[in-house]
């Protein structure tokens, strides 16, 4: 695999990771991503909620969690509370309902700050990938200086492309948070 392909793959992975992180931001709308990564103690081990239950959206502000094993309902509720997501699960038999509260203005501002911080962290990650790729190119003695410079330019174009995508994702999520 060439340095360019490897670099693009790593940058795409960084973008994908940021996208997954952003999906878990609470916007006031019910979304399965809010709780699917919650860790629950069941069967003597810890498991992700998405592995032991189905999560669906009942309406705009309510999630319904249906455990595959009904006996795990209380453990799931405890896991959600322990995750400190500011969500209050209600156990109804073997089903858990979660009403997603409407975020306050202060909470929205804090979420936007966190979002921007995560975006900057992702950009730093992309720039670090660029630096590593450029270092690899410079260390490769088989390449001529012109080839190295050309590849560095292509790597910079990749970096710009992925940073722009990160900014666009951030703007979309900011608009979503602000429009609540």
UniProtKB/Swiss-Prot annotation:
Q: What is its main location?
A: cytoplasm
Could you tell me the keywords of this UniProt record? Answer: Cytoplasm, Protein biosynthesis
Instruction: List, alphabetically, the GO terms of the cellular component aspect.
Output: cytoplasm
What's an example Gene Ontology biological process for this entry?
Answer: translational termination
One Pfam family linked to the record: RRF
InterPro entries attached here?
A: Ribosome_recyc_fac, Ribosome_recyc_fac_dom, RRF_sf
Location comes to: Cytoplasm
**What superkingdom does the record give?**
Bacteria
* Residue ranges the record marks as coiled coil: none
The record's section on SUPFAM superfamilies has:
Ribosome recycling factor, RRF (SSF55194)
A GO MF label:
ribosomal large subunit binding
Q: Which family does it belong to?
A: Belongs to the RRF family.
* Function according to Swiss-Prot or TrEMBL: Responsible for the release of ribosomes from messenger RNA at the termination of protein biosynthesis. May increase the efficiency of translation by recycling ribosomes from one round of translation to another.
From the Swiss-Prot or TrEMBL record, give the protein name: Ribosome-recycling factor
């Amino acid at each position: 695999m060439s340095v360019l392909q490897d670099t693009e793959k790593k940058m795409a992975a960084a973008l994908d990771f940021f996208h997954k992180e952003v999906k878990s931001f609470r916007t006031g709308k019910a979304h399965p991503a809010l709780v699917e990564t919650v860790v629950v103690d069941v069967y003597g081990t810890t498991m992700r909620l998405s592995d032991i239950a189905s999560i669906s959206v009942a309406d705009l502000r309510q999630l319904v969690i249906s455990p595959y094993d009904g006996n795990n309902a209380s453990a799931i509720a405890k896991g959600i509370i322990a995750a400190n997501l500011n969500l209050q699960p209600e156990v109804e038999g073997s089903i858990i309902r979660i009403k997603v509260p409407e975020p306050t203005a202060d909470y929205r501002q804090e979420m936007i700050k966190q979002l921007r911080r995560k975006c900057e962290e992702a950009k730093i990650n992309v720039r670090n990938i660029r630096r590593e790729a450029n270092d690899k190119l410079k260390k490769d003695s088989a390449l001529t200086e012109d080839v190295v410079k050309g590849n560095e330019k292509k790597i910079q174009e990749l970096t710009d492309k992925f940073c722009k995508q990160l900014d666009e994702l951030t703007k979309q999520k900011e608009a979503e948070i602000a429009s609540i």
